[in-house]
Amino acid sequence: MNLVDLWLTRSLSMCLLLQSFVLMILCFHSASMCPKGCLCSSSGGLNVTCSNANLKEIPRDLPPETVLLYLDSNQITSIPNEIFKDLHQLRVLNLSKNGIEFIDEHAFKGVAETLQTLDLSDNRIQSVHKNAFNNLKARARIANNPWHCDCTLQQVLRSMASNHETAHNVICKTSVLDEHAGRPFLNAANDADLCNLPKKTTDYAMLVTMFGWFTMVISYVVYYVRQNQEDARRHLEYLKSLPSRQKKADEPDDISTVV
């Protein structure tokens, strides 16, 4: 083996060794950045799995290169504003089977346009801000939540109109119209425009106000009549108590008779 071949062999060995060393550092770095209670792997991009980890909130130390994030089957109750804003490569987000009740207006800021799958099924979501899902391109799963069907939900689902599955699986737990409770949202929306309903609340308030005024007027009239009757009775008793001015039989007439 000549010197050139020996040099090439040693150079190749050094390159392979350096490459292995760099890969080890990267793997160690990724592992060290993995949130507590989660498992991280690099299969098809960084996969962060935090399922069944007894998490009460979304970790704030998620690696920025996360592509798939599984936070299902925990005890998370809310999704704060901009919690995912640094995860620009995020494609899949699973938050199913938690106790989520609140989703802030800008919860998905930074990932709304890159997400491909969003799973919020099997939570406790009753309503969300009308802008919570703005620009969301993901296929969203929001079934098995106690949704309150009203104008806001109608606006939210209309903003996600490209995803028919999203609205199709929404069942109204409660509704501004009692007859829609327990029915699929699409059926309720076909029956009535939830953003253009008669203002029954105003009518009820007006009726209550009118009834209150009517009651006050009747009460005043009854009081006034009774008070007048009492005053009349007292006046009559007073008159009866005065001495009688009857003429005595032996008193001469005041008028003299002219003979």
Swiss-Prot record:
LRRCT domain segment(s): 145-197
Signal peptide limits: 1-33
Cellular compartments annotated: Membrane
LRR repeat start and end residues: 65-86, 89-110, 114-135
Domain LRRNT: 34-64
UniProt entry tagged with the keyword Transmembrane helix: yes
UniProt xrefs under InterPro entries: Leu-rich_rpt, Leu-rich_rpt_typical-subtyp, LRR_dom_sf, LRRNT
Residues passing through the membrane, by range: 205-225
Pfam families reported in the protein's UniProt record: LRR_1 (PF00560), LRR_8 (PF13855), LRRNT (PF01462)
Top-level taxon of origin: Eukaryota
Major site of localization recorded for this protein: membrane
Gene Ontology cellular component terms for the protein in this record: extracellular matrix; extracellular space; membrane
Keyword terms, alphabetized: Glycoprotein, Leucine-rich repeat, Membrane, Repeat, Signal, Transmembrane, Transmembrane helix
Membrane topology annotation: Single-pass membrane protein
Glycosylation sites: N47, N94
Keyword rRNA-binding (UniProt): no
Family: Belongs to the LRRC3 family.
Protein name: Leucine-rich repeat-containing protein 3B
Species per Swiss-Prot/TrEMBL record: Homo sapiens
Lineage: Eukaryota, Metazoa, Chordata, Craniata, Vertebrata
